[in-house]
Amino acid sequence: MSELLLPPEHRYAKIIKERHNEDGSELSVLNLGPTHPATHGIFQNILLMDGERILEAEPTIGYIHRAFEKIAENRPFYQITPLTDRMNYCSSPINNMGWWMTLEKLLGIEVPKRAQYLRVIVMELARITDHIICNSILGVDTGAYTGFLYVFQFREKIYEIYEEICGARLTTNMGRIGGFERDWSPEAFRKLDKFLEEFPPAWKEFENLFERNRIFLDRTVNVGGITAEKAMAYGFTGPNLRAAGVDYDVRVAHPYSSYEDFDFIVPVGKSGDTYDRFCVRNAEVWESLSIIRQALEKMPAGNEYHAEVPDYYLPPKEDVYNSMESLIYHFKIVMGEVPVPVSEIYHAVEGGNGELGFYLATDGSRTPYRLHFRRPCFIYYQAFPEMIKGALLSDAIIILSSLNVIAGELDA
């Protein structure tokens, strides 16, 4: 049997024996996960340790694999949206909008400018939520619990905005082909204005708690670094790539949903270490706030919140209950009886943790012929073993946290 097919414990046994014979080192094998609280999800890493230092690492994935891509091949297009919610659930509206935009690209549907701006606001709120979670949890892993408690109240305020828009909080299933299911209420805009007023001072204090904190700096500077060349070789995108010094953002390189209408800076780091990843996400929160304000200022007048495409757009529920025509359209669309061309496309959006891509191939039937999700977490986790070699066990936890690997997206 090839050594590569042996379990890590067996392969490591040979290394342990050789090292013990050479210099008397007492090496050990440690299972980190799959149900360890420090890993923030169902991850397993089998580590070869020399004391507290990691010599080798091998990840095991698939503990919560749900075969999303195969399930999608047997579902009508509208019924796939809930699957996207359950990948990176920290920023699920971005996943929803990415999927709708993929279908709109396939069908050649032009979304009204106002609906595009509303989507931008939702996606930037989701990005803020994602970065709040990632950076505050990184603080917890370095021993600073205060920041986590301080900013998590604002995640709740964003969830209240989601609730006002679509009725859901975490797995939002937000939007429709062509726009939104309903126009935003005045209460949604009021809550958004209140968030934009209250959150910036709190985020500034959060930054001050960490960016000049000597203990935090000691735990994160020059820890888990990766070069720009290595990051690109692995296929890094998002904050993890930009922290390594590469200026690439899907919103700028391939604008969608009218992102070209907004002025914002793409924050870029230098060393690609844990501290740079933290700082890039902090800076991106400020840019997201700026984009939201610009979208509100430039919002077109009127109440256009969806494209006029009755063959694809689900009618409002009140119409379904009171109109036979709306009921028929609702049934046809949900059950997949909609005209779809034979085609294949790829569409990507800038997710909370990197480029989230959708490759969709259709054969004209009511379900996709093939659907592939480009999941940034899957790529980061491949680099994780190399990034923690030679690091201390306590540093490995921090490095994983700074990469923002979400188990639901990793395994899909």
UniProtKB/Swiss-Prot annotation:
<comment type="function">
    <text>NDH-1 shuttles electrons from NADH, via FMN and iron-sulfur (Fe-S) centers, to quinones in the respiratory chain. The immediate electron acceptor for the enzyme in this species is believed to be a menaquinone. Couples the redox reaction to proton translocation (for every two electrons transferred, four hydrogen ions are translocated across the cytoplasmic membrane), and thus conserves the redox energy in a proton gradient.</text>
</comment>
<keyword id="KW-0997">Cell inner membrane</keyword>
<dbReference type="Pfam" id="PF00346">
    <property type="entry name" value="Complex1_49kDa"/>
</dbReference>
<dbReference type="InterPro" id="IPR014029">
    <property type="entry name" value="NADH_UbQ_OxRdtase_49kDa_CS"/>
</dbReference>
<dbReference type="InterPro" id="IPR022885">
    <property type="entry name" value="NDH1_su_D/H"/>
</dbReference>
<dbReference type="InterPro" id="IPR029014">
    <property type="entry name" value="NiFe-Hase_large"/>
</dbReference>
<keyword id="KW-0813">Transport</keyword>
<dbReference type="GO" id="GO:0051287">
    <property type="term" value="F:NAD binding"/>
</dbReference>
<dbReference type="GO" id="GO:0005886">
    <property type="term" value="C:plasma membrane"/>
</dbReference>
<keyword id="KW-1003">Cell membrane</keyword>
<comment type="subunit">
    <text>NDH-1 is composed of 14 different subunits. Subunits NuoB, C, D, E, F, and G constitute the peripheral sector of the complex.</text>
</comment>
<dbReference type="InterPro" id="IPR001135">
    <property type="entry name" value="NADH_Q_OxRdtase_suD"/>
</dbReference>
<dbReference type="GO" id="GO:0050136">
    <property type="term" value="F:NADH:ubiquinone reductase (non-electrogenic) activity"/>
</dbReference>
<protein>
    <recommendedName>
        <fullName>NADH-quinone oxidoreductase subunit D</fullName>
        <ecNumber>7.1.1.-</ecNumber>
    </recommendedName>
</protein>
<keyword id="KW-0874">Quinone</keyword>
<dbReference type="GO" id="GO:0048038">
    <property type="term" value="F:quinone binding"/>
</dbReference>
<keyword id="KW-0520">NAD</keyword>
<keyword id="KW-0472">Membrane</keyword>
<comment type="similarity">
    <text>Belongs to the complex I 49 kDa subunit family.</text>
</comment>
<keyword id="KW-1278">Translocase</keyword>
